[in-house]
Every structure is written in structure tokens, then in C-alpha cells.
Amino acid sequence: ESAHSIRFLYQHFLSGITEKSLNVFYYACSYAKVDYSRFMNTTVRITLKLIPDSLQTQPVFLCVDDTMVSKFGTKFENVSKLFDHAAHNGCNYLNGHCFVSVMLCVPAWNRDKVSYLSVPLGYRMWQKKESKLELAASMIRQVMPEFHSKDHVVILCDSWYTKQNM
């Protein structure tokens, strides 16, 4: 299940680990001068610690993807006309936002077999001033120092990400 809002996160998680009110989190998200990109680094460090010793030599995967979110109104900030190659509705364009995301997949044991846990690290909303490739590269550069002890970090992405230097 995805987190739909700050309220959802508060009701299902944050209220169980702190006595702070919901308004504190609203305020922090709105006004605090926080470098949220550092959360990606912290998430990587915590996730890498979850890998069992017996699987430390297995590769980890950084997955990069983009996704589009349709908007039906016209007054949304940064809304654009986007090409949707996967559209099956007769029109390859939609009005909306495009997000580029990075996810970390780490090995874990599942019934005596290796399976991979997927942990979202971060996402950025694409705007015309910066390409999706530049957004992806920026997020990858942000987290790569956390992998200094890993020998096998594989980046997985759609083929068009490799058309230019990342």
C-alpha cells in the first residue's frame, strides 16, 4: 500500500514512534530548511545493513524509472503535455506530471531462496529545465558514496537512459 499523504504516514507509522502531533510534520514539510536528498543516503545505509552476512557478496541493484501521473485540471504547477509510449487509450499524449524515481533492491532469504527486497529511495518531478536523465544521474550520484563497501552495484534502467552519458 502506498503512502497517500502526510496524514496517512502519521496515522499508520509516525504516531507509533513519536508523541509529536500531526501539525509538527505538516510544519516540517512546509517550512523546515531540510535537505531531503540526505534521506536517500540514510535509507541506503539502513537498507544495506539488512543484508544477511551470507548474502553480502550478492549484487545490489539501483533501479531507475520514470512514471507519469495524469492531471485532469489545467491549473497544476509544472503540468506538461507528455508523450506516453505505453498508452492504450488511442492517444499517446497526456496532461500531467512525470516523476523519475530510484529504488534499491537488496538480497534477502525467503524460504531458503534468495529474493530481493525493493526499497524506494527517492523521486524527483521532471520539469523542462532539466532532463529526466539529469535527474536520474543526480540521484545516483547522491547515493553512490554509500556503496563504498559493495563490489557489485548494478544500475537497472530503461534502454533510453543509456542513449546519453549518465
Where are these regions (language model features)?
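Conserved, well-structured functional cores that handle cations and Mg-NTP chemistry
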Residues: 1-166
